[in-house]
Amino acid sequence: MSHPNDSHRNDPSALVLGLDTFGDVPVDDSGVLLTDAAAIRQVVDEAVLADGLGVDVLAVGEHHRPEWAVSTPETVLAGIATRTSRIRLSSGVTVLSSDDPVRVFQRFATVDALSGGRAEVILGRGSSTESFPLFGFDLADYEVLFEEKLDLFVRLLQERPVTWEGTVRPPLRDAQVLPRTESGRLTTWVGVGGSPQSVLRTARHGLAMMLAIIGGPPERFAPYVDLYRRATDQLGTPAHPVGMHSPGFVADTDEEARETYWRPYREIRDRIGAQRGWPPLRRAEYEAEIERGSLYIGSPETVARKMAATVRSLGVGRFDLLYTAGALPVSARLRAVELYGTKVIPMVRDLLAG
C-alpha cells in the first residue's frame, strides 16, 4: 500500500531539491580569506542566483564557530527574502535548545512576512554545542531543554493565545505571540541525526523529519524513515514527506570537483575532529565516502545519479545538498550553484521519472 510520504515517487516534480550552507568563510580567487561580513553577503548573492535558477529551497545553518559566519540564520534569510521571489527560505538548523521558542517563532514569522509565505524552520538540538555555554545553558540539560522547548514551539504553531508551563523558561498565561503568519501556518521540521528517540519525538509532535546524513552509506537510515512512517500511522499524526541533508559539491568534471573540495573539506573536518577525538581524515577515506558513502561530489551527471539513487532508496521527498565546506573559492561556489540549478536538478527529475 502506498504511503502519503511516497507521492513524489510517482511525480518527480513533487520532489523538493534544495541547497544548504552554514555560511562557511570562503576565499577569493587569489586565496585571501573573506571577512565574516563579506561571507554573509556572499550567501545572499548565492541565494539570489539559486532563486533565478529554479532551486526549490535554500537552508542556512546556525553555528557559533570561526569557520562559519552565520550565527543567526533568520537574519540572513530576511535579507535574502527581499531579493528573491520564489525560493523557499529555511534554517538548517536553528538550535532551539539554546534559544527561546517564542523569539524563534516571532523571527521566522517575520521572515515569512518579508518573503510572502516562503519561510520554513528546521529545529535541532545542536550537534555543535558552542551555543550552550555562550548563552548560559548547561549541557547536562541537553535533553530536557529540547523536549520542553519543542513542546512549546508546537503550541505556538497553533497561533492562538498560549498557556504553557515547564522548567526551562518562565510560564506563559494566555500569551499572544506576534506577528501571526498570513497563512496561519509555519512549515516546521525537526533535524534528526540518527536517534530513534528523536524520530519518535518528531512523529509524536506531528512535525516533518529532516535527516542529517553526513557519513556512511545513506541506506543505513532506511530504518529511521520506516520508523517515522510507522509512528505517524500509529499515532494518527500528520504524515509529512521525509527530508535529508548531505554534503557535496558540483564542478564541471569529477576530477575538478574532488580536487577543489578535498583540501577545504579536510581542513575543516580535521579542525573539528581534533576537538572531538577523531583521527585526521585520509584521502582514501574521502574517496571511499564519495564512492559509497554520503559525499555527493563530482560532475552534474555523477552527483545527479547518486542523488537519484538515494532518493529512490530512502523514499525521501526533499534533498538538500550542503554545497559549502570551509575555505572554498567564491568562484567555485557560484559555479556549483549554477550547475546544481541548471543541470543536476533536471537530471535528478529525469532519472526518477525514468
Show the residue positions of the predicted features.
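Short, acidic/polar
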Residues: 37-49, 193-200, 302-309
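Structural motif
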Residues: 53, 114, 205, 313-314
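Conserved, mostly hydrophobic/aromatic
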Residues: 17, 54, 62, 80, ...
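An alpha-helical appendage that flanks or caps ligand/catalytic pockets
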Residues: 2, 8-13, 19, 143-177, ...
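Internal, glycine-rich beta/alpha segment that forms the wall or movable "lid"
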Residues: 3-15, 19, 29, 100-207, ...
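Hydrophobic faces of well-ordered beta-strands that scaffold small-molecule active sites
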Residues: 17-21, 58-60, 89-91, 119-123, ...
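N-terminal beta1-alpha1-beta2 module of alpha/beta enzyme domains
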Residues: 1-88
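Active-site mouth loops of central-metabolism enzymes
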Residues: 25-40, 94-102, 184-194, 291-300
